[in-house]
Design a protein with these regions (language model features):
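Short aromatic-glycine motifs in intrinsically disordered, low-complexity regions
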Residues: 38-50
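Short, compact, well-ordered microdomains
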Residues: 50-76
Length: 76
């Protein structure tokens, strides 16, 4: 299992236990992922760290002074 943390700007867009689809954005240097439809965005990853799966399960949603952070677990 692989976990990735996504930044979400407002609450209630996803729930713990929900299955989500992610899309990949490729730049010349790295890749990042977005929970669709434009719910939350991941940090940057190197090409050799790319996801093999495009579907995951929301495991945790944390709120702090910087916003909402969604942890998604992928089956890889």
């Amino acid at each position: 299992m692989r976990k990735i943390v996504f930044k979400m700007e407002r609450p209630g867009l996803v729930e713990e236990g929900q299955t989500v689809e992610v899309s990949e954005s490729v730049t010349p240097v790295n890749v990042n992922y977005m929970i669709e439809p434009a719910v939350a965005m991941s940090g940057l990853f190197k090409f050799n760290e790319r996801l093999k799966s495009r579907q995951g399960v929301v495991k945790e949603i944390i709120q702090n002074d910087r916003g909402y952070y969604v942890t998604v677990e992928f089956d890889e």
